[in-house]
């Protein structure tokens, strides 16, 4: 499912227009992105949590040459699914 299909589904389920559904989806994405970028954890009970996680610096290898190289520490976005979401996906 792509964004357009999700907007169509949201508009149908919320009994609203596609324009309103698209605006709400964009606002949700922007809000979660901004909160996680500011170091906040966004939790939607039953669905899951969005947060920033720190990856430690480590040593890697260049796949072409085999030379060792340092990979710096970085912060990445992460999603942890909630119990209701996991149960729905697994068919329980």
Model-derived features with residue positions:
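Strongly charged
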Residues: 1-92
């Amino acid at each position: 499912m792509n964004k357009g299909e999700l907007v169509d589904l949201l508009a149908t389920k919320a009994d609203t227009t596609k324009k309103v559904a698209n605006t709400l989806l964009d606002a949700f994405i922007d809000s979660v992105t901004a909160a996680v970028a500011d170091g906040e954890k966004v939790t939607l009970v039953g669905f899951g949590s969005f947060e920033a996680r720190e990856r430690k610096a480590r040593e890697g290898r260049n796949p072409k040459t085999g030379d060792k190289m340092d990979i710096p520490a970085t912060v990445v976005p992460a999603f942890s699914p909630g119990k209701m979401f996991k149960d729905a996906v697994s068919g329980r």
